[in-house]
Every structure is written in structure tokens, then in C-alpha cells.
């Protein structure tokens, strides 16, 4: 039976939620933590501000934002997988973060008014949405003038030799890790497909410009396997 991209992605994350955090560490060799840490430094998040984490998943970046804005700030996490949000809710509860609210919703139609947030982030989620540009424009819409929108995502390595190794790893090794650690071979096969088909850093930077962002900053990580794109709204 035919499944749309959105339906397939929803099925994937509703199934792998229990193993998602562990598998992130396995797949990236824990580098994703360093990538996010560096991205947060570049964002220079200020106390008392308001942030939205789109495709928040199990809320790791949401929590990092909440700690950065402090008790006087507000952070919202948005995701379409209720199972992923349940894991996130437990983390928020354990940390007693009163300034965090997790919302079940769709990145293609963000349920907030225009010009609401100082920061809007999306971490390893943009490649899974049905239409990249629609989501970038939605993020642009809800960020305030002067605010920042940040995407941390897999990218396309350009280093000869390493690029071929990267594709081999994602195509053959990562699904095996999924089967071994999460009993989810098919689901992790999908994740490698989404990473393979995602735009490279220069193409995504142009998409940021097309969505209306200015003063775009791009930073590649670990030979280009991931990249941060940061755009400002005038």
C-alpha cells in the first residue's frame, strides 16, 4: 500500500521512540552532542527569551534551549509523534523545567502567530518533512524580526573518498545497527534514505535565502556529515 512521506516518517518515529536517543549516539558516535553544543554557542541564546524547537522529538534540544533562556524565558517543543513527545515529557519532568511546553503538531503548519519567537530551531528533522521550503517559511513566519532560525542537520560530505565511505556507512551499516540495537532494520533504512536525499550545505543555504533569511551562517561538522545553517529575519 502506498504511503506518503509524512505517513512513512510518522510510522518510523512512532516505532523507534524507545531507542531513538540511544541510536543517535550509536549512529553519530556521540558527535551529535558536540555539534549541538557548538551550534548553541553560535546562537548566543539570551536569558528571558522565547524559543521554539520544531520537530523536537525527545526534546534534547528543547531542554538545552530551556536551560539557556533560564526560568524567565519560555520554550516550546513541537512534534507530530506522540510517542516521541512522551519521552520528552518525562525528561522535562525529571529536570523540573517549568518553562517548557511540548505540543503535538505539524511543522508544515506551525500553530503559533507571526513574529512570536526570538529563536526557532530544527535539529535532524528538516530532512523528514514533506516539503523543506514550506517548513523554512513557517519558521521564518513565527520568528520575530531580528530573531534567529537554526537548522542542524545531516549534510553531504564533499571530501573525495570520505564521501563514498559515508554513503556506505549510511546505506549498509546504519540499518544493521538499527536491527541490532533497536530491532528496526526497515525504519533505519528509511533514515539513511532521507539523509542521502537531503540537500547539501550550499543548496540548503540558498533555500534559507529563498525563504527570506539574511546574514546566513553555515558551519560544517566532521568532514561535512552534518551542517548548521543559521539565518536572521530582518
From Swiss-Prot:
Free-text function comment from the UniProt entry: Methyltransferase required for the conversion of demethylmenaquinol (DMKH2) to menaquinol (MKH2).
Binding site for S-adenosyl-L-methionine: 58, 79, 106-107
Pathway: Quinol/quinone metabolism; menaquinone biosynthesis; menaquinol from 1,4-dihydroxy-2-naphthoate: step 2/2
Enzyme class: transferase
UniProt record, GO biological process: menaquinone biosynthetic process; methylation
Reactions this protein catalyses: a 2-demethylmenaquinol + S-adenosyl-L-methionine = a menaquinol + S-adenosyl-L-homocysteine + H(+)
InterPro entries assigned to the protein according to its UniProt record, in alphabetical order: MenG_heptapren, SAM-dependent_MTases_sf, UbiE/COQ5_MeTrFase, UbiE/COQ5_MeTrFase_CS
Enzyme Commission no: 2.1.1.163
Taxonomic source organism: Geobacillus sp. (strain WCH70)
Gene Ontology terms for molecular function: demethylmenaquinone methyltransferase activity
Encoding gene (name): menG
Family membership noted in the UniProt record: Belongs to the class I-like SAM-binding methyltransferase superfamily. MenG/UbiE family.
Name listed for the protein in its UniProt record: Demethylmenaquinone methyltransferase
Organism domain of life: Bacteria
Keyword Transferase attributed: yes
Record keywords, A-Z: Menaquinone biosynthesis, Methyltransferase, S-adenosyl-L-methionine, Transferase
HAMAP family to which the protein is assigned, alphabetical: MenG_UbiE_methyltr
Amino acid at each position: 500500500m502506498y504511503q506518503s512521506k509524512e505517513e512513512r516518517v510518522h510510522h518510523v518515529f512512532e516505532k523507534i521512540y524507545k531507542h531513538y536517543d540511544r541510536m543517535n549516539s550509536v549512529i553519530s558516535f556521540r558527535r551529535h552532542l558536540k555539534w549541538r553544543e557548538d551550534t548553541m554557542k553560535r546562537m548566543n541564546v539570551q536569558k528571558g527569551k522565547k524559543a521554539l524547537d520544531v520537530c523536537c522529538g525527545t526534546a534534547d534540544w528543547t531542554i538545552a534551549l530551556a536551560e539557556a533562556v533560564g526560568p524567565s524565558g519560555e520554550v516550546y517543543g513541537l512534534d507530530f509523534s506522540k510517542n516521541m513527545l512522551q519521552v520528552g515529557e518525562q525528561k522535562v519532568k525529571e529536570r523540573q523545567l517549568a518553562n517548557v511546553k511540548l505540543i503535538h503538531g505539524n511543522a508544515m503548519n506551525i500553530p503559533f502567530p507571526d513574529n512570536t519567537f526570538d529563536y526557532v530551531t530544527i535539529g535532524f528533522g528538516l530532512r523528514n518533512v514533506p516539503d523543506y521550503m514550506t517548513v523554512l517559511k513557517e519558521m521564518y513566519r513565527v520568528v520575530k524580526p531580528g530573531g534567529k532560525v537554526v537548522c542542524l542537520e545531516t549534510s553531504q560530505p564533499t571530501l573525495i573518498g570520505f564521501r563514498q565511505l559515508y554513503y556506505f556507512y549510511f546505506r549498509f551499516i546504519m540499518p544493521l545497527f538499527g536491527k541490532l540495537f533497536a530491532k528496526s532494520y526497515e525504519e533505519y533504512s528509511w533514515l539513511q534514505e532521507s539523509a542521502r536525499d537531503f540537500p547539501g550545505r550550499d543548496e540548503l543555504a540558498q533555500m534559507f535565502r529563498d525563504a527570506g533569511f539574511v546574514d546566513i551562517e553555515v558551519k560544517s561538522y566532521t568532514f561535512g556529515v552534518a551542517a548548521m545553517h543559521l539565518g536572521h529575519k530582518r
